[in-house]
Amino acid sequence: MKYFAELKRSMNFLAQDSRTVFLGQAVSVAGTAMSNTLKEVPSDRLIELPVAEEMQMGMTTGFALTGLVPVSIFPRWNFLLLAINQLVNHLDKIQVMSNGGYKTKAIIRTGIGSQRPLHPQHQHVGDFTEAIRMMCSTIEVIRLEEPKDVFPAYEWALLRDDGRSTIVVEYGDYYGEK
């Protein structure tokens, strides 16, 4: 069982559900390591977006409100930080603000950038998992430490029946190391 293979298997599993749509930068074109895990996902399920993180999170919330399960891909934490307003004040709070009337189940995929073979500097390798856990009251944050953790996390994120969103945090270095 390899980390990258499990990520690919997870994306293919998610794509089998007619409610899922994948959106973000470099989802339908090469550009990030995450792009390589989406190669077998049907192209009509991939929505390529410009670098506009807050817009992407707003679209994610909108798709979730319609009953879709968006898989919103932010290649590293530093991209997701730019969508923090939409994440914390909208996606995370809609269920609470509507007294349970609206559920916004989304899967947010992000990563801790690779440090090897060359360290790209702190902007790309930050891990904000704990900070986001403290900011969000309804979104679960799962960090994928081992290959055996990958598929169950994505399966849970899709099949959970509580209407909650899940942020799944990957390690860039593990794509080729584990």
PLM region descriptions:
Residues 1-178:
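Thiamine diphosphate
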